[in-house]
Amino acid sequence: MKKKSILLLTGIATFYFNNTYAQETVQDSTRTASIDQVVITGNSRPKAKIESSTAISTFNAKEIQKQNPISAAALLQRVPGFAVETSGGEVGNNLFARGIPSAGAYEFTQVQEDGLPVFEDGALQFANADNFFRVDNTTGRLEALRGGSGSIFATNSPGGLINFISKEGTNDFKGVAKLETSTYGLMRTDVNLGGALIQDKLFFNVGGFYRTDDGIRKTDFKANQGGQIRMNLKYVFDKGYAKVYYKKLDDRNTFYLPIPLVRNGNDITEFSGFDANYGTYSYRSISQLNIPQAGGGFFSRNLEDGIHPKVDVVGAEFKYDLGNNITVLNKTRYTNIDLNYTGIFPAGGPTSAADFAKKKGITGNTFQYSLVSSGQNVNPQYVQELGFWAIDKKMNNFVNDLQFNYKFDTGNITAGFYKSNWKSQQNWNWSNILTTATNNPELLNLVDSSLLPTSTGYSKTYNGVTALSFLLRDSQVQGSLNDLYANLDLNVTENLNLNAGVRYSRDFYKGYSVNTTSGNLNNSGLTTDGTHSFLTTTADDSMSVLGNQYSYWKYDIDKVSYTLAANYKINSNNAVYSRFSHGFRSPNEEAYYNYFTTTNPDQPLKPVTTNQIEVGYKFYTRNFDIGVIPFYSTLKNLSFTDVFSDGSSENTFADTKNMGVEIEGFARLFNNVMELTFNGTIQDPKYKGLAGNSTLEGNTVRRMPKLYFNISPAVNITKEWRTYVSLNYYGKRFQDQTNQDTLPSFSEVGAGMSYQLGKIRFAVDATNVFNTIGITEGDPRSPSVQSAGNSTIMARPIMGAAARASITLDF
């Protein structure tokens, strides 16, 4: 493990020190100075960044290429105010905006492509927004807005907007082709082509990627395999344009869950037999599940399918000048998603073989473990019960955003109507399996040797399964959103701009869930091994059976969001602004399920409401820029809805407050020889009025660091050579609201280099070069394992050291 870190670092250092300094080349000067940038996200019309009263970060295509993020979440780590957990792999990651706590996903921040949501709700169960889009060379730009006007230009987004803007064709034909490989078996091809079919009139862009790799954590199967294609066609006429586009995504990715670690104070070390940097329970030897169902038939699943979305998107955009300074813009999109989700979710931590047998009712030393694969008797020191979770979701979303803009001498007014219909139908089938507590787990059977094989309860497993289909869920959620919004931009003077916005949301939600009963296979006529009936095993004792009784529910939203801001441009390089915003977030999917399946809920179901105040200072030149944005926010009716390993859900409510400051900066130094990029956040998120336990008043919000930042210096060694180092720091957090379970701070170092040879760019990028064991989360599904007194914990660390090499041709 240490050897891999040293080799990675040595290779990078060799290139660094064996070259001399020189000015930055034109080819690799990729960053557009902030003073020249124009932004649209969170604004009614394109506006110079220095004149926008928003906290917004931008990345163009070349900057994204230079950073070469392994996932969308890795790219968003470069945005201040966004605390991002990237340890799940390429998808399924979590983003927390400005200290707003949640169960994960993108609950308070809407992820968009070209100004419309990837899916209307980015925090549906097992359907994180980043499951359904990928960053590749078809991405032309990223704009990431925090807080502010997010609640005016989108629904359920008080935390901000993340807008991935696609490339479009121009009169000049342009293309990019990229080949990439890695230390973990990566083979990836990216292509993008764009140009004009009719000069000045008809433009096209088409591109995508295909990738396969073994995963940084060793699964013994293809951990990531698939790709996407995106295309658009734009026709420009005298008074506007019309654009149509299509996206097809078919990709599967392994999702990494907590592994056992040893905690000694603030020190985290490996659990015996488990590699913290490269180990995982998601392994080929336990990847197949085929079990009988109490309602008849068999249920089969393959872990190698991982998170597997099939996404089809078709959309159109139309803009027309109506005359008299009035323009109309209409965006429409239909999204269809078929998601198969399969993952290994630990059901607690490693247990001694004797203790687990005792838990299953075997007293004394009459327990016997054996390998399912060979039948060989074994005596493991520790065993691990794992949840084999299978979820299928069928989702669709039709959205239309119609807006009118009136421009006058001192500003403009935008008014619009937003309509979105969406549906999510899901089916769960969860079982528990028993394995060795090691890197490459083996399925185990457990029997009570004091009984005869024909005795009731002789076996505690069925081919390694301890609980067959213990949880089934069949449920649906639908949303019908009907929102009116208006935004005013007023230039009071040449330097002073006022902004005011309001959004009225009349939204309707409904759904159903199917009630379940308990069953077993005792009278099914099936056998466990061709001879013995299911009376001989306890694995089927608590099976779930879907019934015919449906529970239907409805929930309506009638809320107003609003914002007021001012931006004062001191001179061409300096500006200050302030903003107040009020927004909300509708209850999430699990909150609906919990509330409407509970006979007498102890809390009313309410939207989460937010109030935010921010002030900002911006200083932009061509070689230096900095933004400093203090903020204060309060939230009411925040619900915590983590799903536990036994299938039950947390149902906790709280109010929170947070005060902090975001800092973002860039500098070109020493005649462009060196570049320095920095973003960081200091905050102090606290609980207020946690329901049912006032002793938690003032505790730090769980999973939220008080300090996190990224700093990345780069040196242009010669006209062709460039090298960089990056440091991600993630401060100490608490896994629980009692603030007893500490997740230590950690730093992750990355490094890389590139060589520009004409239009060809060679690059090597390395991540976590020191093999840091950095924990991003504990195990929210098994909170008892994380108690402060336990030396063995379950947690999800970042990936181990890895390197990627790429060749890119721009033409």
Language model segments and positions:
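Acidic/polar loop-and-plug regions of large Gram-negative outer-membrane beta-barrel proteins
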Residues: 241-317, 340-389, 444-477, 481
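C-terminal beta-signal and adjacent terminal beta-strands/loops
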Residues: 730-734, 754-811
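Short acidic/polar hinge/loop motifs at secondary-structure boundaries
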Residues: 117-146, 165
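Structural signature of Gram-negative outer-membrane beta-barrels, strongest in the C-terminal barrel
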Residues: 395, 410-422, 427, 431, ...
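Gram-negative outer-membrane beta-barrel transporters
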Residues: 494, 623-641, 649-738, 773, ...
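N-terminal periplasmic accessory domains that precede
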Residues: 72-75, 94-99, 109-112, 129-132, ...
